Each structure stands twice: as structure tokens, then as C-alpha cells.
Amino acid sequence: MSKLLSIIIPTYNMEQLLPRCLDSLLVKGALDRIEAMVVNDGSKDGSLTVANSYKERFPESVTVIDKPNGNYGSTINAALPVAQGKYIKVLDSDDWFDSESLVRFMDCLESIDTDMVITHFSTVFEDGSKEITKYNVYGKEPYEYGRAYDLDDVLEDGYIRFFLMHGITYRTQMLRDMGYRQTEGISYTDTEWSCYPVFRAKDITFLDIDLYQYNLAREGQTMDPKVIARSLGQVEKMTMQLLEFYSGYDLSSLSKIRLDFVKQYYTNRLRLLYKTYLLDIPRDMFVADDMNRIDLKLTEACQKYGFGPIKLYPANKILRFDALRYWHRKHSRWPVWFEKFNHFVDVVMTWLFVRIFKKSK
């Protein structure tokens, strides 16, 4: 492999934002060591033209794959087999890397050989403010930066419940050795990127670098609650794909520590689907028959694979009323008055958290 890092950039109708994304990568100190792989997923705007213009300017650092639309997972599947980097990372085309952090990251990768590398990332809001995400608990950062850890040793201490796509970099050969592929034709498959390789990875390194800049300002993103409400079918399909992967994996190859972590991860994923139905989507879009159907599937999965127990408490951690238990007893969501009260408490607790906890840092 002739590059240190391949960066897969799934692109669909991102003509206006793709230049910012690419400009953040093609900087002195990183340029010669990266491969920016723009995968044009059947864009109907000028995204392909933009990508090709960068390829002409930076032929040694930019590659372009043009393909029919197949949704997010298909872009990963198209890029992974031909990636030249020792390591590989995904960068959505409406997001970007902090350029100075990228150079530092590349310098660190020169002396790293672990299957996973974890960095910080920032969520960038519409007003330009940023919130950095680190793998810490109540302000404690339990891992020594730059040190190689056995992944089981990290998972055993319980600090980490899941990994997020924005913070993950994988060793490319590890993904190829496990035959990694993402589901095509549906959204939210970045969940697979942060889940499946954890079954296989042996070791991990944490770096004190705020690399990925996650753009939360753009309208229409798939994580917007209103968009999720309209895409419940795809959220459900993605959950079923996760369960299919679990059922087909040789679990006997996993240590008890790894298996316990994976089971807890899956429990949290099922809880997230319940949360979408019972807490997130607007009441006028809620269909009780759909909830009954998915409840039967998830209950069966919990019994079959030993997931759970699943409890669904409000995010504010003040009101301790289990929405899933209420559903099983009443076959309905919380009363309207309680949902409104819960929302009020959520707002108050968020305000207090920002005013007190964050300002004390």
C-alpha cells in the first residue's frame, strides 16, 4: 500500500459542500500521505464535476469512483477493495477534518499498528458553536493517549458502551480479512461500520486529537427526528441486519469480555429502536400496530440471544418512568400531559447541564 490513510467520502448531491470537505484534507503535511476517495453515488448535481476537478489538481492524492445510486453502504463497498491506505476512515461529504489535527493524526499513524484508532470529534451547530466528544466518563479520561491496548482490556473496564463512526479509524487489512461489507440500499448503515469490526479487532489506540468535524447544521440529515420518523422502515431494516450479522457470526471465537460487550451493545441498539417509536416520533405519526409488530420481533431476539433487560427511561434522569413497561401494560404511549412534562424537564436539565457542568470545565 502506497498511502498511510485512505479516506472514503460518500457523495450524493453535495456540489456546494464537497469543496470544503476536500480542502480540509489536501493540506501540506498530509497531502502526500492520504488518499481521498470520493465515491459519487449517482449524484444529480455537479458533485462529480467538482470531484474530478480536484482529481486533476491532486492526481496523487484524490481518486474518484463514479457509480449508480445504491445508498450509503454501497459507497463503502465500492471503495474498500481498492483503497491504498494502511488505515481507512469514512468522512461524509458535508463534514470535514480539522486540517491541523489531520497533520498531527498522520504523524501519529506513522508509528501505530493497532486494528482500531480512536480520535475525538466535534459536533458543529448552526450558530457555529462546537461540542467536542471524547471517550471519557464524568470528565475522566481513562486511557493513555498513544498507547496500544488489547481491545478486551479496554472493553472490560466498562467505560465504553459503543464506538461512533466519527471517531473510528480501522486498519484496512483487518476489514478485508473479515470480508467486511455494508448493507446496500438503505440508510443508517454507518451503524455497521461502528459495530461489525469490533467483533474482529484485536487492539486499539486512543489519540488526543479532535479530528472529525460533524456538521449538524444542514437540514435534511438522516439523524433529524423528523427524517427518522419518515424513515422508520429503514431504521427497522438496519436493526434486523445487525441481528442477522450477530446470528451468523461464530460467537465461540469471542472472549467472554467481548461477547458481554457485544450483547450490551445490541441491547442498546434495540433500546434505540424502541426509543424511536415510543419517545421520538411525533404522536400523529405513531402507529400502534407497527409498534406491536416490532415489539414481537425484538422480544423474540432478546429471548433468543440473551439480550436485555431493556428499560426506556427519560433522558433527563429525573423522571424514572419506563416507557417500554408502560407500553406493555397499557399498549399505548405515555399520556400527552406526561410527554409534555417530560419534555419540559428535559429542557430544564439540558439548560442546567450547559450552565453548570460545562462552564465548570
Task: Show which residues each predicted segment covers.
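A conserved acidic beta->alpha catalytic loop
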Residues: S24, N40-T49, P68-G70
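Membrane-interface aromatic/basic loop that binds lipid-linked glycans or pyrophosphate carriers
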Residues: L278-K361
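Cell-envelope/extracellular polymer assembly enzymes that use nucleotide-activated donors
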Residues: K3-S6, E35, E192
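Donor-binding/catalytic cores of nucleotide-activated saccharide
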Residues: Y72, I76, S93-L207, Y212-R230
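Short aromatic/hydrophobic "clamp" motif used to bind/position activated sugar donors
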Residues: I88
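Glycine-rich, basic loop-to-helix element that forms the pyrophosphate-binding segment
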Residues: K67-A83
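Short, well-formed alpha-helical segments that are part of the catalytic scaffolds
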Residues: M14-V27
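Short beta-strand/loop segment that forms part of the nucleotide-sugar
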Residues: R33-G42, T63-P68, S93
